Amino acid sequence: MVFSDVLQEVSSRVEGSIGYVVMGMDGIPIERLIADRRHNFDMIATESTTLLRSTRQASEELGAGPLRELSFATDQFTVLAVAITDEYILLGALSNESNYGKARFYMKRAALRLEKEFV
C-alpha cells in the first residue's frame, strides 16, 4: 500500500485530524497529508523532530531500547509519534476534540503496515 493511502485512511477514521506525516528521524518528510489548514502542520512536524531526537537519545542513554511512541498535548492540539522502524516515524497532529485512543490505535496499525514498505 502506498504511503498516501495509509495516511488518508488514518485521517478518514479519526475526526479532528490536523495532519499526518511519514518522516525520518532527521525530520525529512517522505509523505504528508494535511487535513486541517487552521494549524501550521509543517511547523508542528518540524518542531516535533527536535523533541523526538532528544527523547530517542535519552531512551538510548538509559538503556531503555528504541523509542516506540511519544505524545504531547498543548492547549490547541495533541501530537502523537509512532515508530515505523528505528529510523522512520508516523507523526500525527490532532485537535483536542479528537479521540486520542482511536488515533493511537489507527496510527499503530498504520505503522505496522508501513513497516513493510521499508523492509
Task: Say what each PLM segment does.
Residues 1-119:
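Non-catalytic interaction/Regulatory regions outside core domains
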